[in-house]
Amino acid sequence: MLLDDFSLVAGLDDNIAFSESVELTMNIENVGAETSGDITATLIPQTQNVYMTSPVFDVDPVSSGDIVEVGPFAFDISTNVQDQDEIIFHLHIQDDQQSWEYPVSFNVNAPDYQLSSSFIFDGGNGSLDPGEIATVQLVLENIGSAALNYPTFLVYENDEYLNLGEISSDNAYYWDSGTSVVLSFEISVSENAPLGHSAISWINIGSLNTDYEFLFPLPVTVGMLMETFETENFL
Protein backbone atom coordinates (compact mmCIF):
# COMPACT_ATOMS: atom_id res chain seq x y z
CA MET A 1 0.00 0.00 0.00
CA LEU A 2 1.42 3.34 -1.09
CA LEU A 3 0.49 6.79 0.20
CA ASP A 4 -0.52 8.47 -3.06
CA ASP A 5 -1.83 11.91 -2.07
CA PHE A 6 -3.74 13.79 0.60
CA SER A 7 -6.06 16.77 1.01
CA LEU A 8 -6.96 18.81 4.05
CA VAL A 9 -9.51 21.30 5.27
CA ALA A 10 -8.42 23.78 7.95
CA GLY A 11 -10.78 26.60 8.83
CA LEU A 12 -11.77 28.40 5.63
CA ASP A 13 -8.76 27.25 3.60
CA ASP A 14 -6.04 24.60 3.37
CA ASN A 15 -3.50 26.48 5.51
CA ILE A 16 -3.11 25.07 9.01
CA ALA A 17 -3.13 27.71 11.74
CA PHE A 18 -2.84 27.69 15.51
CA SER A 19 -5.92 26.52 17.46
CA GLU A 20 -7.67 25.26 14.30
CA SER A 21 -9.50 21.98 13.83
CA VAL A 22 -8.23 20.13 10.76
CA GLU A 23 -9.59 17.28 8.63
CA LEU A 24 -7.09 15.26 6.60
CA THR A 25 -8.04 12.75 3.89
CA MET A 26 -5.44 10.30 2.57
CA ASN A 27 -5.39 8.52 -0.79
CA ILE A 28 -3.69 5.13 -0.66
CA GLU A 29 -2.91 2.92 -3.65
CA ASN A 30 -2.47 -0.82 -3.83
CA VAL A 31 0.66 -1.11 -5.97
CA GLY A 32 0.93 -4.84 -5.37
CA ALA A 33 -0.19 -7.67 -7.62
CA GLU A 34 -2.89 -9.00 -5.27
CA THR A 35 -5.93 -7.66 -3.47
CA SER A 36 -5.16 -6.57 0.07
CA GLY A 37 -6.87 -7.82 3.18
CA ASP A 38 -9.02 -5.63 5.40
CA ILE A 39 -7.02 -2.50 6.18
CA THR A 40 -6.69 -0.40 9.30
CA ALA A 41 -5.15 3.06 8.86
CA THR A 42 -3.98 4.98 11.92
CA LEU A 43 -2.62 8.53 12.02
CA ILE A 44 -0.18 8.78 14.93
CA PRO A 45 1.12 12.21 16.07
CA GLN A 46 4.85 12.45 16.77
CA THR A 47 4.81 15.98 18.23
CA GLN A 48 3.09 17.47 21.27
CA ASN A 49 1.39 20.35 19.45
CA VAL A 50 -1.51 18.38 17.97
CA TYR A 51 -4.40 16.41 19.47
CA MET A 52 -6.15 13.63 17.55
CA THR A 53 -9.94 13.53 17.60
CA SER A 54 -10.44 10.90 14.87
CA PRO A 55 -7.25 8.85 14.44
CA VAL A 56 -8.33 5.42 13.03
CA PHE A 57 -10.22 4.24 9.94
CA ASP A 58 -11.01 0.76 8.66
CA VAL A 59 -10.97 0.12 4.91
CA ASP A 60 -12.37 -2.78 2.89
CA PRO A 61 -9.91 -4.85 0.82
CA VAL A 62 -8.32 -2.85 -2.01
CA SER A 63 -7.85 -4.44 -5.43
CA SER A 64 -4.50 -4.30 -7.19
CA GLY A 65 -4.02 -0.91 -8.86
CA ASP A 66 -6.93 0.76 -7.07
CA ILE A 67 -6.73 4.03 -5.12
CA VAL A 68 -9.05 4.60 -2.17
CA GLU A 69 -9.73 7.55 0.11
CA VAL A 70 -9.17 7.07 3.82
CA GLY A 71 -10.52 9.50 6.39
CA PRO A 72 -11.04 12.22 7.13
CA PHE A 73 -8.66 11.97 10.06
CA ALA A 74 -9.41 14.83 12.44
CA PHE A 75 -7.13 16.70 14.83
CA ASP A 76 -6.87 19.97 16.72
CA ILE A 77 -3.82 22.24 16.66
CA SER A 78 -2.51 23.55 19.97
CA THR A 79 -3.33 27.15 20.77
CA ASN A 80 0.20 27.99 21.85
CA VAL A 81 2.43 27.02 18.95
CA GLN A 82 5.19 29.10 17.41
CA ASP A 83 4.91 30.38 13.85
CA GLN A 84 6.00 27.67 11.38
CA ASP A 85 6.27 24.99 14.05
CA GLU A 86 6.20 21.55 12.44
CA ILE A 87 3.57 18.95 13.23
CA ILE A 88 4.65 15.42 12.37
CA PHE A 89 2.58 12.25 11.98
CA HIS A 90 3.20 8.65 11.06
CA LEU A 91 0.50 7.07 8.91
CA HIS A 92 0.40 3.38 9.85
CA ILE A 93 -1.38 1.08 7.38
CA GLN A 94 -1.91 -2.58 8.18
CA ASP A 95 -3.76 -5.56 6.75
CA ASP A 96 -3.72 -9.18 7.91
CA GLN A 97 -0.38 -9.88 6.22
CA GLN A 98 1.87 -6.83 6.46
CA SER A 99 2.12 -3.17 7.42
CA TRP A 100 3.39 0.08 5.94
CA GLU A 101 4.31 3.39 7.55
CA TYR A 102 4.69 6.85 6.03
CA PRO A 103 5.77 10.17 7.57
CA VAL A 104 3.44 13.14 7.07
CA SER A 105 4.28 16.67 8.22
CA PHE A 106 2.92 20.21 8.02
CA ASN A 107 3.92 23.68 9.19
CA VAL A 108 1.57 25.73 11.36
CA ASN A 109 0.83 29.42 10.87
CA ALA A 110 0.75 31.52 14.04
CA PRO A 111 1.35 35.13 15.08
CA ASP A 112 4.84 36.32 15.98
CA TYR A 113 5.94 39.70 17.21
CA GLN A 114 8.68 42.30 16.83
CA LEU A 115 9.25 45.62 18.56
CA SER A 116 9.33 48.25 15.80
CA SER A 117 9.89 51.35 17.93
CA SER A 118 9.66 52.65 21.49
CA PHE A 119 9.31 56.09 23.03
CA ILE A 120 9.53 57.54 26.53
CA PHE A 121 7.43 60.59 27.37
CA ASP A 122 8.86 62.00 30.59
CA GLY A 123 8.79 65.74 29.89
CA GLY A 124 12.55 65.76 30.08
CA ASN A 125 15.52 64.00 28.53
CA GLY A 126 13.72 60.94 27.13
CA SER A 127 15.30 58.48 29.57
CA LEU A 128 14.04 56.64 32.65
CA ASP A 129 15.64 58.41 35.60
CA PRO A 130 15.49 57.55 39.31
CA GLY A 131 12.38 58.96 41.00
CA GLU A 132 10.63 59.57 37.68
CA ILE A 133 7.19 58.63 36.38
CA ALA A 134 7.00 58.35 32.60
CA THR A 135 4.74 57.03 29.84
CA VAL A 136 6.19 54.35 27.58
CA GLN A 137 4.79 53.92 24.08
CA LEU A 138 5.63 50.84 22.02
CA VAL A 139 4.89 49.96 18.41
CA LEU A 140 4.64 46.17 18.15
CA GLU A 141 4.33 44.43 14.77
CA ASN A 142 2.81 41.03 14.03
CA ILE A 143 5.50 39.48 11.85
CA GLY A 144 3.96 36.01 11.94
CA SER A 145 1.88 34.12 9.39
CA ALA A 146 -1.50 34.38 11.12
CA ALA A 147 -3.74 37.09 12.53
CA LEU A 148 -4.70 37.36 16.19
CA ASN A 149 -8.38 37.89 16.97
CA TYR A 150 -9.36 40.19 19.84
CA PRO A 151 -5.82 40.78 21.15
CA THR A 152 -5.38 41.45 24.86
CA PHE A 153 -2.33 42.82 26.66
CA LEU A 154 -0.94 42.73 30.18
CA VAL A 155 2.40 44.12 31.30
CA TYR A 156 4.29 43.16 34.43
CA GLU A 157 7.71 43.07 36.05
CA ASN A 158 9.40 41.56 39.07
CA ASP A 159 11.86 44.24 40.07
CA GLU A 160 12.29 46.23 43.28
CA TYR A 161 13.01 49.51 41.47
CA LEU A 162 10.27 49.53 38.83
CA ASN A 163 6.49 49.66 38.90
CA LEU A 164 4.37 49.32 35.75
CA GLY A 165 0.83 50.62 35.33
CA GLU A 166 -2.04 49.29 33.26
CA ILE A 167 -1.35 48.87 29.55
CA SER A 168 -3.61 50.19 26.78
CA SER A 169 -3.80 49.33 23.07
CA ASP A 170 -5.19 50.98 19.94
CA ASN A 171 -6.44 47.61 18.62
CA ALA A 172 -8.76 45.27 20.51
CA TYR A 173 -10.39 43.50 17.55
CA TYR A 174 -8.18 42.06 14.80
CA TRP A 175 -4.39 42.12 14.59
CA ASP A 176 -3.50 41.03 11.09
CA SER A 177 -0.13 39.71 9.98
CA GLY A 178 2.10 42.55 8.79
CA THR A 179 0.33 45.23 10.84
CA SER A 180 1.22 46.98 14.10
CA VAL A 181 -0.43 47.97 17.36
CA VAL A 182 0.49 50.90 19.59
CA LEU A 183 0.78 50.07 23.29
CA SER A 184 1.10 52.57 26.13
CA PHE A 185 1.69 52.18 29.85
CA GLU A 186 3.01 54.18 32.78
CA ILE A 187 6.28 53.28 34.46
CA SER A 188 7.62 54.63 37.73
CA VAL A 189 11.24 54.33 38.81
CA SER A 190 12.27 54.23 42.45
CA GLU A 191 14.38 57.11 43.75
CA ASN A 192 16.83 54.45 44.96
CA ALA A 193 17.30 52.89 41.53
CA PRO A 194 20.98 53.00 40.50
CA LEU A 195 21.81 54.42 37.08
CA GLY A 196 22.39 51.61 34.61
CA HIS A 197 20.16 49.19 36.51
CA SER A 198 18.63 46.70 34.06
CA ALA A 199 15.54 44.54 34.39
CA ILE A 200 13.25 42.51 32.17
CA SER A 201 9.56 43.32 32.01
CA TRP A 202 7.06 41.23 30.06
CA ILE A 203 4.12 41.89 27.79
CA ASN A 204 1.60 39.07 27.98
CA ILE A 205 -0.17 38.94 24.62
CA GLY A 206 -3.45 37.04 24.68
CA SER A 207 -6.64 36.53 22.70
CA LEU A 208 -9.97 37.24 24.37
CA ASN A 209 -11.74 34.18 25.83
CA THR A 210 -9.01 31.76 24.69
CA ASP A 211 -5.96 30.08 26.23
CA TYR A 212 -3.58 31.81 23.83
CA GLU A 213 -0.55 33.35 25.54
CA PHE A 214 2.68 34.83 24.20
CA LEU A 215 5.24 36.39 26.55
CA PHE A 216 7.15 39.18 24.84
CA PRO A 217 10.29 40.29 26.76
CA LEU A 218 10.91 44.00 27.20
CA PRO A 219 14.30 45.00 28.68
CA VAL A 220 14.37 48.18 30.78
CA THR A 221 17.47 50.13 31.82
CA VAL A 222 17.46 53.10 34.19
CA GLY A 223 19.14 56.22 32.82
CA MET A 224 19.54 55.08 29.22
CA LEU A 225 18.74 57.63 26.50
CA MET A 226 16.38 57.00 23.61
CA GLU A 227 18.98 56.87 20.88
CA THR A 228 20.90 54.21 22.82
CA PHE A 229 18.11 51.87 23.82
CA GLU A 230 16.45 51.89 20.42
CA THR A 231 19.62 50.40 18.99
CA GLU A 232 20.00 47.85 21.77
CA ASN A 233 16.28 47.16 22.40
CA PHE A 234 16.44 48.63 25.90
CA LEU A 235 14.13 51.21 27.45
Name each region found by the language model.
Residues 12-20, 125-132:
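Short, solvent-exposed loop/linker segments at the N-terminal edge
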Residues 24-29, 65, 89-91, 136-141, ...:
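Buried hydrophobic-core signal for structured, non-transmembrane domains
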Residues 74-112, 188-222:
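Terminal connector regions
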Residues 29-50, 57, 141-163, 167, ...:
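Short acidic, flexible loop segments centered on an aromatic residue
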Residues 1-5, 106-117:
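Proline/serine/threonine-rich low-complexity linkers at boundaries of modular beta-sandwich domains
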Residues 51-81, 162-193:
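Intrinsically disordered, low-complexity Pro/Gly/Ser/Thr-rich segments with frequent PxxP/GP/PP motifs
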Residues 2-12, 118-125, 231-235:
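Short, solvent-exposed loop/edge segments of extracellular or virion-exposed proteins
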Residues 219-235:
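Extracellular carbohydrate-recognition regions
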